[in-house]
Amino acid sequence: EMCIRDSQRQVRRWSENYRLSATETIDDMDRLMAWLPDHLPTSQGASIVHGDYRLDNLILAPDQPQIRAVLDWELATLGDPIADLVYHLMAWVMPRSDTGAGTGSLMGLDVEALGLPRLEDHAADYAQAAGRSNLPPLEPYLAYNFFRLAAILQGIVGRVRDGTASNDNAKAMADQVRPLAQAGWHWAQQAERS
């Protein structure tokens, strides 16, 4: 029950942040805020999570497929390790963009030619390294992480609007909120079909 409450608390937190900074109505965000509390999987146990675990926060060994260091730990907290893993896996399914969240996207690239594993293999490698026989369905976690990222970007846009922050990329961030919400809703619908 504690794990379920934490998932609901996270959705409630990001929903409140989003609503406080909203500059327009985005139906997919409203759908996600209604759908997520009842559809996030029960947490797979608490552990230290990075909070911003993505490829550009990793230093990789130049001569072998090995992580040498993980950078930027300021968002670290206790949480669901699968949610942290799936945030990392978003690079494989994130719509490509020249600015902001999509700049690190691997979508449409030949990841194996880049020396990276396919998403399915990467997730399986994680499960094996973590001593897990399998992973829960990833689609609800993808829906949550796209929702969370959209809420974070909208929060920045809202602070710029309110004059409490400045960001030269605020327009580009604002332009990404809707596509991220659409991607989140896409994954929620995929979860319903699974």
Task: Tell where the protein language model's regions lie, with residue ranges.
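Short, small-residue-biased leader/transition segments that mark boundaries at the very start
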Residues: M2-C3
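Catalytic cores of eukaryotic secretory-pathway lumenal/extracellular enzymes that build
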Residues: V11-R19
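Regulatory N- and C-terminal appendages and interdomain linkers associated
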Residues: D27, A151-S194
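Protein kinase catalytic-loop region centered on the HRD/HxD motif
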Residues: L40-S47
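Catalytic-loop of the protein kinase fold
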Residues: I48-H50, L55
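Hydrophobic residue at the +6 position relative to the catalytic HRD Asp in the kinase catalytic loop
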Residues: L58-L60
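Activation of the activation-loop gatekeeper triad in protein kinase-fold domains
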Residues: L71-A76
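Active-site activation/catalytic loop segments of kinase-like enzymes and analogous catalytic loops
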Residues: A83-G131, Y144-D162
